[in-house]
UniProtKB/Swiss-Prot annotation:
Residues 49-74 are annotated as: Disordered. One of its GO terms (cellular component) is mitochondrial matrix. The modification N6-succinyllysine is found at K122. Its cofactor is Zn(2+). Upon metabolic stress, forms a complex composed of FOXO3, SIRT3 and mitochondrial RNA polymerase POLRMT; the complex is recruited to mtDNA in a SIRT3-dependent manner. Also forms a complex composed of FOXO3, SIRT3, TFAM and POLRMT. Interacts with NDUFA9, ACSS1, IDH2 and GDH. Interacts with PCCA. It catalyses: N(6)-acetyl-L-lysyl-[protein] + NAD(+) + H2O = 2''-O-acetyl-ADP-D-ribose + nicotinamide + L-lysyl-[protein]; N(6)-[(S)-lactoyl]-L-lysyl-[protein] + NAD(+) + H2O = 2''-O-(S)-lactoyl-ADP-D-ribose + nicotinamide + L-lysyl-[protein]. This is NAD-dependent protein deacetylase sirtuin-3, mitochondrial. Processed by mitochondrial processing peptidase (MPP) to give a 28 kDa product. Such processing is probably essential for its enzymatic activity. It comes from the Eukaryota. Has some ability to deacetylate histones in vitro, but seeing its subcellular location, this is unlikely in vivo. Keywords: Metal-binding, Mitochondrion, NAD, Transferase, Transit peptide, Zinc.
Length: 399
């Protein structure tokens, strides 16, 4: 009986760790350290976790031996998707013929999963607007990329001739992506901080798309906003940090690359703006903004997708090429009965090569697509007032 008593006590202690939430601030919590893997893995993983803390299978628990912390789960790392085989040319010629914004429903495909969509019928942009107006969609998850920031004056990383990469030709980069790779950063951090100076919060202002997302939040419809952007314009527009998952990092915080001491992003702003590489005042190591480089783990908040996407009743995808994983594959994480609305220049990612019958694509200029949706929603006046009010705050009385 004593043996089983100690085992029950150990299990209760471990369960106490599991129930903590990912959103708990300040470092890696117990849920982040063990909860996702143990809860999602099932009974075998729980018992394996107990065995991992106390030896091989069948070894009695030692009451005098404290529980050891289970290993931290592997957080997804950023990497670029390999190009998939091109779709038939006649298909793409029908949607790339001009720059005019067009709307169409993507044809149904064979989808396996709960809530199959093949019998739901196709949707249009107006149908999506009516679902929102009728509050049939109240848990909206949004995925955004660099395309929503280009109207603010920030060039797209991958646009030939206008991307930020092309502005760094003065540096002897072995290839453009090297600026976001740790080995090159440790060898020469100057190119990255030149880029950081241009992107640092305060240099650019939100545009209509950012304020549309803010309006979704104000109306209580935004479950979560997943952004690939590091410009911080979602925060500037007034969307609270609790609603954001900045999948590729943020300038709002920074970390010493040597002693791992954390710093507020504003602490290194003066150095960045003065073209100086920021240094840790304790160990003199380089202080790097918490931007995710290729091969680095994504922020712990990215794990919220495990809960958010199954709960979503509408997925909006705005201004992204869906080329970087694991962000791109999140589009497949919603239920197959959930509408997916893409507002983008081109048909991309799973919506191109694995479409569903309830997919809607509004192709063309992103801002024009958002304005069309706002008009169908009847939010034009509210949007205009919000933009004027927030722009006035950013400009200030003396500007």
């Amino acid at each position: 009986m004593a043996f089983w008593g100690w085992r029950a006590a150990a299990a209760l202690r471990l369960w106490g760790r599991v129930v903590e939430r990912v959103e708990a601030g300040g470092g890696v919590g117990p849920f982040q350290a063990c909860g996702c893997r143990l809860v999602l893995g099932g009974r075998d993983d729980v018992s394996a976790g107990l065995r991992g803390s106390h030896g091989a299978r069948g070894e009695p628990l030692d009451p005098a031996r404290p529980l050891q912390r289970p290993p931290r789960p592997e957080v997804p790392r950023a990497f670029r998707r390999q190009p998939r085989a091109a779709a038939p040319s006649f298909f793409f010629s029908s949607i790339k013929g001009g720059r005019r914004s067009i709307s169409f429903s993507v044809g149904a495909s064979s989808v396996v999963g709960s809530g199959g969509s093949s019998d739901k019928g196709k949707l249009s942009l107006q149908d999506v607007a009516e679902l929102i107006r009728a509050r049939a969609c109240q848990r909206v998850v949004v995925m955004v990329g660099a395309g929503i920031s280009t109207p603010s004056g920030i060039p797209d990383f991958r646009s030939p001739g206008s991307g930020l990469y092309s502005n760094l030709q003065q540096y002897d980069l072995p290839y453009p992506e090297a600026i976001f790779e740790l080995p090159f950063f440790f060898h020469n951090p100057k190119p990255f901080f030149t880029l950081a100076k241009e992107l640092y919060p305060g240099n650019y202002k939100p545009n209509v798309t950012h304020y549309f997302l803010r309006l979704l939040h104000d109306k209580g419809l935004l479950l979560r906003l997943y952004t690939q952007n590091i410009d911080g314009l979602e925060r500037v527009s007034g969307i609270p940090a609790s609603k954001l998952v900045e999948a590729h990092g943020t300038f709002a915080s920074a970390t010493c690359t040597v002693c791992q001491r954390p710093f507020p992003g504003e602490d290194i702003r003066a150095d960045v703006m003065a073209d100086r590489v920021p240094r840790c005042p304790v160990c003199t190591g380089v202080v790097k903004p918490d931007i995710v480089f290729f091969g680095e783990p994504l922020p712990q908040r990215f794990l919220l997708h495990v809960v958010d996407f199954p709960m979503a009743d509408l997925l909006l995808i705005l201004g992204t090429s869906l080329e970087v994983e694991p962000f791109a594959s999140l589009t497949e994480a919603v239920r197959s009965s959930v509408p997916r609305l893409l507002i983008n220049r081109d048909l991309v990612g799973p919506l191109a090569w694995h479409p569903r019958s309830r997919d809607v694509a509004q192709l063309g200029d992103v801002v024009h697509g958002v304005e069309s949706l706002v008009e169908l929603l009847g939010w034009t006046e509210e949007m205009r007032d919000l933009v004027q009010r927030e722009t006035g705050k950013l400009d200030g009385p003396d500007k």
